[in-house]
């Protein structure tokens, strides 16, 4: 008997219990967040049972199908697909979310609406699980939109702040652009294949470029690729637990997961693979450059997320979706930990986010600073940490790929920049003399803060090794490789470390100077927000205002109604030119009446 699907249903049932509790009086008590956290931890433990059973079963996938409705000739069904991608991702997402929720018990303890906050976090997780386990486009779209609306609600959680509201609107608007591509793909598949079922789509394998372009636009919007990227750093206006969940295992990796899920359609289409490769390469380099000069600790980590998403896109572009999925899973651990460490630092330093006003935290907050270093080193791909097992494989695969040498060089440069801004983050926040106010009380003794970071630190060390052992090879791996190509990823990482340390030591003795154009380009995010959010709307609105004014003048004063009134006024002035001679007017009236009376008689 197959017990994988029943245990998966038990996992989902455990997660829905706190949602049902929100309709009872228990929702109004202070213990509700603890119930939600416990439910997620139990769900993670039960999810490990079907995960181990699946990995030991040597099966490709398990599919459950319940008929829902029939529309003309197309059947809609509630269909769940448990394969390697979905079952591993669900376990990783549950583990990371459990840690983030426990961290939120400490971080959000004073928020008056903490119960609603935890409910939103849980719904965020459930919608992502719907997305990754969906076996048809309609069900996938439900999870896709659910993730989008929950991100809008959570980014704008502190609705009293204008920046938070603006960031939430940015996120939802940029994602609407991606949704257009997704809906166009759904419409094309329905029109030409008469099916939204993934198995039927993969069996028919449409060769048209249009649906694949729609999927690429959808992924670019959701995963903040170049052109649709400005919402990701703006989303840092939300609470830190939201940033951790958004960047690790839910929203931003949904676009990459979509392309991983549809790789059977992309793998034999060189045009879409080249477009994906180039888009990912541009994204990973541009966002790495932007991260080099940022001073907000959360924005540095946010740009590192965008850079890693570009690297995942490059991996899909070289036709290695399993490696992209491995990087999604390994990235979730250290990225969530980095955000939680930054949240701990911000909380202790009285909401200070500027790394130039930190320093010396290795002595004041040794546990948080140590975990921040572990996460940063894992991000750079330091050997035998979690990031190494995916990032090094990706660089090796790119080295042996014949697709695009330009994209490979850009990716290597971005990898070096990753080491540079990670070193800068560690150097400014943890090392050197303290630069924060002396009266700040620093405390990192709360177990709700320490335990989740410890778990994620262990994941950042060991998870990559454990998950990489179960990655099924898509293509026969390279049997031989020159030593210089094997060590290229490590070489550029060490180069980035050395350059960053050298620059940090040199700049301590320099006098302030006017920033050069390259520095301004990086710190102002390539002028992209100013051009897209300020200059372009300004000229469009000015043009619209001028057109509206001209239309009003033409319609009101030249055609109607002012012109009609002017015509009537001119006619009345011509026909009756009044002079104010009342006696003459009265005499004319009497004469007229007398003549009329005589005619009648």
From Swiss-Prot:
Q: Which Pfam families match?
A: NADH5_C, Proton_antipo_M, Proton_antipo_N
Q: Where in or outside the cell is it found?
A: Mitochondrion inner membrane
Q: Which GO terms describe its cellular component?
A: mitochondrial inner membrane; respiratory chain complex I
Q: Does the keyword Cell cycle apply?
A: no
What organism does the record attribute this protein to? Dasypus novemcinctus
InterPro entries per UniProt: NADH_DH_su5_C, NADHpl_OxRdtase_5_subgr, ND/Mrp_TM, NU5C-like, Proton_antipo_N
Q: What EC number(s) is this enzyme filed under?
A: 7.1.1.2
Recorded hits in NCBIfam families, A to Z, give:
NDH_I_L
| Superkingdom to which the source organism belongs | Eukaryota
Could you list the residue ranges forming a coiled coil in this record?
Answer: none
* Recorded catalytic activity of this chain's protein: a ubiquinone + NADH + 5 H(+)(in) = a ubiquinol + NAD(+) + 4 H(+)(out)
Q: Which family does it belong to?
A: Belongs to the complex I subunit 5 family.
User: What's this chain's function?
Assistant: Core subunit of the mitochondrial membrane respiratory chain NADH dehydrogenase (Complex I) that is believed to belong to the minimal assembly required for catalysis. Complex I functions in the transfer of electrons from NADH to the respiratory chain. The immediate electron acceptor for the enzyme is believed to be ubiquinone.
Q: Which UniProt keywords apply?
A: Electron transport, Membrane, Mitochondrion, Mitochondrion inner membrane, NAD, Respiratory chain, Translocase, Transmembrane, Transmembrane helix, Transport, Ubiquinone
One GO term in the molecular function aspect is: NADH dehydrogenase (ubiquinone) activity
Segments passing through the bilayer: 3-23, 36-56, 84-104, 114-134, 140-160, 171-191, 201-221, 240-260, 272-292, 324-346, 365-385, 404-426, 456-476, 483-503, 581-601
Indicate what this protein is called per its UniProt record. Answer: NADH-ubiquinone oxidoreductase chain 5
Membrane disposition: Multi-pass membrane protein
Q: Which processes are annotated in GO (biological process)?
A: electron transport coupled proton transport; mitochondrial electron transport, NADH to ubiquinone; mitochondrial respiratory chain complex I assembly
């Amino acid at each position: 008997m197959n017990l994988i699907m029943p245990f998966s249903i038990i996992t989902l049932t455990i997660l829905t219990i706190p949602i049902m509790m929100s309709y009872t009086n228990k929702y109004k008590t202070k213990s509700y967040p603890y119930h939600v956290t416990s439910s997620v931890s139990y769900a993670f433990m039960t999810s490990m049972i079907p995960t181990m059973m699946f990995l030991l079963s040597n099966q490709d996938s398990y599919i459950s199908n319940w008929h829902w409705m029939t529309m003309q000739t197309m059947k809609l069904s509630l269909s769940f697909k448990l394969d390697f991608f979905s079952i591993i991702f669900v376990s990783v997402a549950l583990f990371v979310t459990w840690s983030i929720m426990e961290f939120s018990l400490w971080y959000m303890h004073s928020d008056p609406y903490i119960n609603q906050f935890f409910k939103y976090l849980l719904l965020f997780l459930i919608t992502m699980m719907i997305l990754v386990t969906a076996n048809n486009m309609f069900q996938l779209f439900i999870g896709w939109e659910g993730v989008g609306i929950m991100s809008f609600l959570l980014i704008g959680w502190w609705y009293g702040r204008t920046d938070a509201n603006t960031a939430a609107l940015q996120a939802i608007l940029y994602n609407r652009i991606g949704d257009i591509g997704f809906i166009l793909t759904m419409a094309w598949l329905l029109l030409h294949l008469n099916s939204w079922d993934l198995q039927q789509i993969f069996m028919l394998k449409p060769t048209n470029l249009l649906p694949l372009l729609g999927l690429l636009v959808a992924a670019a919007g959701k995963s903040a690729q170049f052109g649709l990227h400005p919402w990701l750093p703006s989303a840092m206006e939300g609470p830190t637990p939201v940033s951790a969940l958004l960047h690790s295992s839910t929203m931003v990796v949904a676009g990459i997961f979509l392309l991983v899920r549809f790789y059977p359609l992309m793998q034999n289409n060189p045009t879409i693979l080249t477009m994906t490769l180039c888009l990912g390469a541009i994204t990973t380099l541009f966002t790495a450059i932007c991260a080099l000069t940022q001073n907000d600790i959360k924005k540095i980590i946010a740009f590192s997320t965008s850079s890693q998403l570009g690297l995942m896109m490059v991996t899909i572009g070289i036709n290695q979706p399993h490696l992209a999925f491995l990087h999604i899973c390994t990235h979730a651990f250290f990225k969530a930990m980095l955000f939680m460490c930054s949240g701990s630092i911000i909380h202790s330093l009285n909401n200070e986010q500027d790394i130039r006003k930190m320093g010396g935290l290795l002595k004041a907050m040794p546990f948080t600073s140590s975990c921040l270093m572990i996460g940063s080193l894992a991000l750079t791909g330091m050997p035998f940490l979690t990031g190494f097992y995916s990032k090094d494989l990706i660089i090796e695969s790119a080295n042996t790929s014949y697709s695009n040498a330009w994209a490979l060089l850009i990716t290597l440069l971005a990898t070096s920049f990753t080491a540079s801004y990670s070193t800068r983050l560690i150097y400014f926040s943890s090392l050197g003399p303290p630069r924060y106010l002396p009266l700040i009380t620093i405390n990192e003794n709360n177990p709700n803060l320490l335990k989740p970071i410890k778990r994620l630190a262990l994941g950042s060390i060991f998870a990559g090794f454990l998950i990489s052992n179960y990655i099924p090879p898509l293509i026969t791996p390279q049997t031989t490789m020159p030593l210089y190509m094997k060590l290229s990823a490590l070489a550029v990482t060490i180069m980035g470390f050395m350059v960053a340390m050298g620059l940090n030591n040199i700049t301590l003795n320099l006098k302030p100077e006017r920033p050069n154009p390259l520095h301004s380009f990086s710190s102002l995010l390539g002028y992209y927000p100013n051009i897209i959010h300020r200059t372009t709307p300004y000229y469009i609105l000015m043009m619209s205002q001028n057109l509206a004014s001209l239309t009003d003048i033409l319609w009101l004063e030249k055609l109607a109604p002012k012109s009609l009134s002017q015509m009537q006024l001119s006619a009345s002035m011509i026909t009756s030119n009044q002079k104010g001679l009342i006696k003459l007017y009265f005499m004319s009236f009497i004469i007229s009446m007398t003549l009329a009376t005589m005619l009648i008689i």
